[in-house]
Design a protein with these regions (language model features):
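Glycine-rich dinucleotide-binding loop and its adjacent helix/turn
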Residues: 146-208, 243, 303-305, 524-528, ...
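Rossmann-like dinucleotide-binding cores of NAD(P)H-dependent redox enzymes
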Residues: 96, 188-189, 196-254, 334-340, ...
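Rhodanese-like catalytic fold shared by cysteine-dependent sulfurtransferases
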Residues: 454-465, 469-495, 500-505, 512-545, ...
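Short hydrophobic core segments
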Residues: 139-149, 271-280, 344, 423
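Mid-to-C-terminal Rossmann-like scaffold of FAD/NAD(P)H-dependent oxidoreductases
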Residues: 37-38, 320-434, 465-469, 473-499, ...
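FAD-site-proximal beta/loop scaffold in flavoenzymes
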Residues: 161-185, 261-263, 268-349, 442, ...
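A Rossmann-like FAD-binding core segment of flavoenzymes
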Residues: 62, 112-131, 139, 206-303
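Beta1-alpha1 glycine-rich phosphate/pyrophosphate-binding loop at the start
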Residues: 37-110, 153, 202-225, 362-365, ...
C-alpha cells in the first residue's frame, strides 16, 4: 500500500509516493495540479508586519505580497529611537534595518510607503488606500494581515498642542525632537510619564545635556514592577540629578516667551524648554472597528489561537491585538517587540498552510536601561496578582552579579512571585547593574513551561567567578522561596511590617556597628552570634520579627528561635535593605531655573565649598567593591583610624546605599565629605579626616540635636562599663544619650542600700539567684571567683572613675 504525503510548497501540490518493489523502496513524486497564486495584503510595515512579509516570501515564493505603510519608513528599530536622540546611537541610518527599496528587492514584495489604508471591506475582500498625493484606490486580497500598532495617549489638556510638546512613536517624531533640541538649544525638559519609554527618554535627554524633570501620576516609576523594586530606581534617578515628581498629574500647559510651563495638580509649576509625553499607548483599532471586527474586553483586536480575527481570512498581530494571558487566561495587551515578531512568523505560516500553528501568548518579559541600572521583569508582579485576587507569596533576595571575591561584583536584587502551596512560578523582577537580563531570561523560560520555584533550585548554569557564583542568584531565590513554602521560614513583607510595627518585637540581628548606622525605629539589637545568650529577653507570647541587612542572618536567627520553641516569629523579606529603600522619603524636587543636568557631585557638595587642594592632599585609596553593607563603611572607619587629621580616604564601593551611609557617617563623626559620585554602579567617596569631636567646637555644635540610644542586655561588669564608656563619649560630643536596660541589664542599676519591698515566691527566688547589687556583678571573662571584678573596681577607684 503506497504512503501518500501532501506537500503544498512552491505554488504546486505534489504527492510523495513511497513504493516497495523487489526489496527496495522508491520515492515517486506525482504532480497533481498547479495552485492558484495567492495575494496577501499587509497593513503596517514595522515589527510584526515586516516579519510576516519576509516569512510569507520564504514559504511561498510565487505569492503576490503587498505591504502598505502610512509612514515613510518600514522595519525600523523603534526601540532605539531614544538612544539616537541622546546621541548614544550616532548614525541615523543604523535605525533603519531595511529601506522600502532594499526590503522590496530582496523579498520581491510590493512595498508602498505613505500609502494609508482608510477602509476594509471584508465582504468584497478589498481595502481602500489613500496615497501621498491624496488619491484613493482599492486593492483586493485573498488574505489580509493587520499590524497597525498602537497610538500614543494624548489627553485633551489645555495647551497640549503647543510648540515644543512631543510624543515619540516613530522616526518622524524622532527627527522633530532631535531638530528641536538642537535649534532651540534646549536645557530643561519635562517628561510626563515614567514608563519604559519615559525613563529611556529621561536618560537620553540627560545624556544630551538637558536637565530633566519626570512627572508621574502613580506613586512609582515603571508601573509593571512592584513598588519595592521601583524604589531603588527612584534613588538612582535622584543621584543622577533627575527631578522626580511622583503622584502628580498635569492640569495644563502654557506657552510663554521663555518656553513652556507645566502646571501640576498640587499647584506646582515646572518651567521647561520642551515636554515629552510618554503617558502610554492604546491599540490602533479604528480600521478594525470600522470593518466590523470584534474587539476584546481591553479594547484590542480580538484574535483566536491562530491569530485570526472574527472575520475569516483577516489576521492581526502586534500591539493592536488582545490575547489571553498564558498564566491566567484573562484578556491581555502586550506592547512588546519580541511577541510581535513571533506572531509575525506564526501568522505567515497560518495564512499559507491553513491554521496549523497556535500562538501560546506572551507573559510579558521586558527590560530597560535606566542610566547605570538595569530593570527587568517577566510574568505577573505581586500587585497584579493582588488586583486579580490570586493567592500568591513573594520572596526578595539580594545577591551579586558574580562571585563577591572577584573584582567589581555588583548588587543584584531578585523578586519572585509564586503560588504559596505548589510553588508554581508567577513572575520575577530583577534590578541591578550586570547580569539582570540572563536571570530574567532563564526564569521566563521556566514560567512559560509551567515551572516552579523548585525548578529554580535545579537550574544548571555556567559558573566561573567573573560571571556568576557557585550558587547563582536564581538558585538562591529558589532556596528562599522553598523555605517559605515549607514553613521553615515564616516571613513578613516590608509593607506588612509598616502596618504591624507597633504590635511586634523587632530584633535587628546585625552587628552593633551596623545597628549604629541606622535601623528600623523601635528595633533592639541582638546580633546573630549572641542570639542564644539572650533568649530570656525575647518574649514567647508576643510576635517577633527578625531582620538583618538582606535576610540571611535574620533567617539563621529565626531557625535558632524556632528550634528553641518559639512559634510566632517571622523574618523580614529582603531585610533592612528592602525596608529602608521602600520607606525612604523622596526629597522635594526643585524646578530648574536653567542650565544643564545637575550632577550627583554637585548635589552632594552643595554645602561643602570646593577645595582646590584635593589633588595635593595625601589620599589613601580603598576598593570595597563587592562588599555588602556595612562592609564599605567599616572599611572607611578602619582607613580613617590609620591616617592623620587632614589626610583623605578615597573609597570605591558597589553597594547602592554606600554614598548615603558615608554622608551620614561624616555628619556623625565630624569628618569632612569632600566629594561623591557614581558611575556604572560604582560609588566613589572622598572623605577628609577631621579633628576629634571633643576638641572641635564646630563639630560639637554640628552634633548638637542628635541623639544616641544604647541598649544594655548583660549584667557582666565589663560589658556594662563598655556601655557607659560609649555613653559618656557620645555625651561629650553634645549628644543626648539614652540607655535601655533589659532584664539582665537591670541588675546594673541595683543599689547597695535599697528599700524593703514585698515579693512573692518567684520574686524571692529571682532575688536569691541574681546579683544583689552592682557590687556583685561578675566579668564575662577572667572572673576568678570574683577577684577579676574586685581588681577592676580597685583600679577604677584609684583612677577616680565613679
Amino acid at each position: 500500500m503506497p504512503i501518500l504525503i501532501k506537500n503544498e510548497s512552491f505554488n504546486n501540490i505534489f504527492l510523495w509516493k513511497l513504493c516497495f518493489i523487489e526489496n527496495n523502496y522508491f520515492l515517486c513524486i506525482v504532480k497533481l495540479k498547479k495552485r492558484r497564486i495567492m495575494k496577501y495584503v499587509i497593513i503596517g510595515g514595522v515589527a510584526g508586519g515586516a516579519t510576516a512579509a519576509a516569512r510569507l516570501r520564504r514559504v511561498d515564493e510565487m505569492a503576490e505580497i503587498l505591504l502598505l505603510e502610512k509612514g515613510p519608513y518600514i522595519s525600523y528599530a523603534n526601540c532605539g529611537l531614544p538612544y539616537y536622540i541622546g546621541g548614544v546611537i550616532a548614525e541615523r541610518e543604523k535605525l533603519l534595518v531595511q529601506t522600502p527599496e532594499s526590503f522590496g528587492k530582496r523579498f520581491r514584495i510590493d512595498v508602498r510607503v505613505q500609502n494609508e489604508v482608510i477602509a476594509i471591506h471584508p465582504k468584497n475582500k478589498t481595502v481602500t488606500i489613500r496615497n501621498a498625493e491624496g488619491k484613493e484606490y482599492d486593492e483586493s486580497y485573498d488574505k489580509l494581515l493587520l499590524s497597525p500598532g498602537a497610538n500614543p495617549v494624548k489627553p485633551p489638556l489645555e495647551g497640549i498642542n503647543s510648540e515644543g510638546i512631543f510624543t515619540l512613536r516613530n522616526v518622524e517624531d524622532t527627527d522633530h525632537i532631535k531638530a528641536y533640541i538642537s535649534d532651540k538649544q534646549v536645557k530643561r525638559a519635562v517628561v510626563v510619564g515614567a514608563g519604559f519609554i519615559g525613563l529611556e527618554m529621561a536618560e537620553n535627554l540627560h545624556h544630551a545635556g538637558v536637565h530633566v524633570s519626570v512627572v508621574e501620576m502613580g506613586n512609582q516609576v515603571m508601573a509593571p514592577i512592584d513598588f519595592s523594586m521601583a524604589a531603588p530606581i527612584h534613588q538612582h534617578l535622584l543621584q543622577k540629578g533627575v527631578s522626580l515628581y511622583l503622584e502628580e498629574g498635569v492640569t495644563h500647559f502654557k506657552r510663554t516667551d521663555n518656553g513652556i510651563t507645566v502646571f501640576l495638580k498640587s499647584g506646582k509649576a515646572i518651567p521647561a524648554d520642551m515636554v515629552l509625553l510618554s503617558i502610554g499607548v492604546r491599540p490602533a483599532t479604528a480600521l478594525a472597528q470600522q470593518a466590523g471586527l470584534k474587539l476584546g474586553e481591553m479594547g484590542g483586536i480580538w484574535v483566536d489561537e491562530h491569530l485570526e480575527t472574527s472575520e475569516k481570512d483577516i489576521y492581526a498581530v502586534g500591539d493592536a491585538i488582545e490575547y489571553p494571558h498564558p498564566l491566567t487566561g484573562k484578556p491581555w495587551l502586550n506592547y512588546l517587540a519580541n511577541p510581535a515578531n513571533r506572531q509575525g512568523r506564526i501568522v505567515a505560516d497560518n495564512m499559507v498552510f491553513g491554521n496549523t500553528v497556535s500562538y501560546e501568548g506572551a507573559i510579558g518579559t521586558s527590560i530597560a536601561k535606566v542610566f547605570d541600572m538595569t530593570v527587568a521583569s517577566t510574568g505577573l508582579a505581586a500587585k497584579r496578582l493582588k488586583q486579580w485576587g490570586m493567592e500568591y507569596q513573594s520572596s526578595v533576595t539580594h545577591s551579586a552579579s558574580h562571585a563577591g571575591y572577584y573584582p567589581d561584583a555588583l548588587p543584584l536584587t531578585l523578586k519572585l512571585t509564586f503560588h504559596p502551596k505548589t510553588g508554581k512560578l508567577y513572575g520575577a523582577q530583577c534590578i541591578g547593574y550586570e547580569g539582570v537580563d540572563k536571570r530574567i531570561d532563564q526564569i521566563a523560560g521556566l514560567i512559560k513551561r509551567g515551572g516552579t520555584v523548585y525548578d529554580l533550585m535545579e537550574t544548571e548554569h555556567t559558573y566561573a567567578p567573573p560571571f556568576s557564583s557557585a550558587k547563582d542568584p536564581i538558585a538562591i531565590g529558589g532556596y528562599v522561596a522553598s523555605n517559605i513554602i515549607s514553613g521553615a521560614m515564616p516571613v513578613i513583607s516590608w509593607r506588612e511590617l509598616v502596618e504591624e510595627k507597633d504590635k511586634v518585637m523587632l530584633i535587628d540581628t546585625r552587628t552593633p556597628e551596623e545597628f549604629s548606622f541606622g535601623t528600623i525605629p523601635g528595633a533592639v539589637n541582638i546580633p546573630l552570634d549572641e542570639m542564644r545568650e539572650h533568649l530570656a529577653e525575647i518574649p514567647t507570647d508576643k510576635p517577633v520579627v527578625l531582620f538583618c541587612a538582606v535576610g540571611l542572618r535574620g533567617y539563621l536567627s529565626l531557625r535558632i528561635l524556632m528550634g528553641r520553641g518559639y512559634r510566632n516569629v517571622r523574618n523580614l523579606i529582603g531585610g533592612y535593605k528592602t525596608y529602608s529603600t521602600a520607606t525612604a522619603p523622596l526629597p522635594f524636587p526643585s524646578a530648574p531655573a536653567g542650565g544643564g543636568p545637575s550632577s550627583s557631585v554637585e548635589a552632594a557638595t552643595d554645602d561643602v565649598p570646593a577645595d582646590a587642594s584635593v589633588s595635593k592632599k595625601e589620599t589613601l585609596k580603598i576598593n570595597a567593591c563587592g562588599l555588602q553593607c556595612p562592609g564599605p563603611i567599616m572599611q572607611v572607619k578602619k582607613a580613617m583610624d590609620s591616617i592623620a587629621v587632614g589626610e583623605r580616604v578615597e573609597i570605591v564601593a558597589t553597594d547602592a546605599g554606600f554614598a548615603r551611609d558615608a554622608s551620614a557617617w561624616c555628619d556623625t563623626t565630624g569628618n569632612k565629605l569632600i566629594e561623591k559620585h557614581d558611575e556604572k554602579g560604582r560609588y566613589t567617596v572622598v572623605i577628609e579626616k577631621g579633628a576629634p569631636a571633643c576638641t572641635s567646637a564646630s563639630n560639637v555644635s554640628a552634633a548638637r540635636g542628635r541623639g544616641k540610644t544604647l541598649i544594655l542586655f548583660s549584667d557582666d561588669l565589663d560589658k556594662a562599663l563598655a556601655t557607659f564608656v560609649l555613653a559618656n563619649g557620645a555625651a561629650a560630643t553634645g549628644q543626648k544619650v539614652t540607655i535601655f536596660f533589659t532584664f539582665w541589664g537591670l541588675n546594673v542599676l541595683k543599689k547597695v542600700q535599697k528599700p524593703s519591698v514585698q515579693k512573692d515566691f518567684f520574686g524571692k527566688m529571682f532575688g536569691m539567684m541574681l546579683p544583689s547589687s552592682s557590687l556583685k556583678l561578675k566579668l564575662s571573662q577572667m572572673n576568678m571567683f570574683g577577684m577579676g571584678s574586685r581588681m577592676m573596681r580597685f583600679l577604677m577607684k584609684r583612677k577616680g572613675v565613679d
